[in-house]
C-alpha cells in the first residue's frame, strides 16, 4: 500500500511515469523502509495507467468487499419481567457561581 501511495504521490508531483527509483525516493523522504522488488512490482502493475484509472479500479474492488454484517436480531422477551429498580434522585449541591471573582479577563 505504501508503494502505491508513493507512486501516486510521484505522479501528482508531475512525473507522468514514475520509476521504481522514484517510488523509493518518495518512501525514503518519508522515512519508510523500502524494498526494490516491491517497488518494481507496483511500477510494473501500474505502467501505462493514469491516476483516474487506478482510482476507478480501486473503487470497483472496494465496492465488492462486504462492509459489515447484518444487524443482530433483537432477543425475544423472557417469560417474566423483573421488577424495575426505583431510581433514586440525588440532589446535587449547587455549585457556586464563578461569574465575578473581583477581576476580569481583560482588565
Swiss-Prot record:
Residues 84-93 have a biased composition (Basic and acidic residues). Phosphorylated. Residues 63-83 have a biased composition (Low complexity). The keyword Ribonucleoprotein applies. GO terms for cellular component: cytosolic large ribosomal subunit. GO terms for molecular function: structural constituent of ribosome. Pfam families: Ribosomal_60s. Keywords: Phosphoprotein, Ribonucleoprotein, Ribosomal protein. GO terms for biological process: cytoplasmic translational elongation. Residues 63-107 are annotated as: Disordered. PANTHER family: 60S ACIDIC RIBOSOMAL PROTEIN FAMILY MEMBER, LARGE RIBOSOMAL SUBUNIT PROTEIN P2. Plays an important role in the elongation step of protein synthesis. P1 and P2 exist as dimers at the large ribosomal subunit. Belongs to the eukaryotic ribosomal protein P1/P2 family. This is Large ribosomal subunit protein P2. It comes from Caenorhabditis elegans. The gene is rplp-2.1.
